[in-house]
Amino acid sequence: MALTETRSDTDATSAGDRARRAPSAVEQLIGSGDHTSIGRLFIGFGFALASLSLTLWALTGVDALTDNGFLGSRPAQLAASAQVALLFLGIVPLLLGVAIAVVPLQLGSPSIAFPRAATLSFWTWLLSSGIFAVSIALDGGVLGGDETAAKLGNVSLGAVLVALSLGAVCVATTVMAHRPLGMRLAWVPGLSWASLVSAALLLVTLGSAIAHTVLGQVGRMGPAALATNFTDGLGWLLRGPAVFVFAIPVLGIAIDVVVTASGRRFAHTDVLQLIVGLYAILAFGAWAQLPSALNTALWTLFAFGITVPILGLLGAIGDSLRQGKPVVSPALILSIVSVLLLMGAAVTGWVQSLSLAGQGTLFGASPATLASAQTAFVAGAALLGGAAASLHWSPLLWGGPGNSVEGRLTVPLLVLGGGLLGTTLLVQSVVQLDGETTAFQIFGLLVAVGAGLLAL
């Protein structure tokens, strides 16, 4: 006797409802492969963590103003950790988020390459960034004195670098493989080209840095050894030429913003791509990790040579604006000033090269303070470039106009903060008045004000 199994209509309906159940808001947020959503998350958290990093840097300035009044023995550790956080928790993910959100739209691609990998990149970066921030608070981060917190900072920093590298792979693959049929690389917009070049340089730069964090973990290093590992193995990321790598997308943002503002394309786009490529070559700094690489002919060539593409881009921007009828907007002002801040970083490299010339007594400038000045200039340029991109592509990113009152209010704060922070550190390194209490307090006040304005 055969039995025929049947399901009631109610069971069938409930099964269908379960199959068609829409994912919750949390599930959509975590599992989204939409490139604009991922990009917005990178941009938003990048701005927020950059602000926190600058606030921490400003606190070290306030501590100097009060003659080491409340941070005790931690100013050096907090200043170094703030600069590392500003780069890898702030400006790099910020510009990466701009690329993830905008580049597919520029190329006419419906999505970014490896969307799940891009999502994984963001959540890994966010979780690791939170752990790194906690380690800083516990006297870890970089140059920290607590053993457990220092190890936690080293591991979390390595995870941050891995996550950013994964995101860079997604962007580079999108530019290489998701272009429409017939579009050559020579025809891609400025941001797409700069993002491709930036991704390539990030992979080789961050890959070398990841190796040093792995050595710190495998070697079971204590706080003192990890501090030495950072100074000798990762400190090169905070000085030229390597620090310029993190601002490569700023050049592409400036190109696209100027094209829109002037209403005309640049006459020679191939020359602009050459300028971005030359900048990237001269920003490659993994070869200059050891202190012995400084004060060499090659290092001096890189320090002075980076000026050429920056001046070339400024000249191209000026010529384009002169021939067109530019519409002045907050994005245009921020993008131009961002390139000028890169010029400030290049001038800081000149000072360092001249100071190290011969026996290193020409200026007697502080190498550590000069490196901080370069980091400040580059970080300021990246923040201004990221803000310019956020305003310029505001309809695509946020669904509203970028020429708002809030956007206009951010311009003076960012311009003054970026210029003041870098210039203060540059002047402080040259005049060498650290031994005088009053001068030390004045410089501390200016650093606090500059970092505070950028944080706002």
Spans of model-derived segments:
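Membrane-embedded and interfacial regions of multi-pass energy-transducing membrane proteins
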Residues: A2-L456
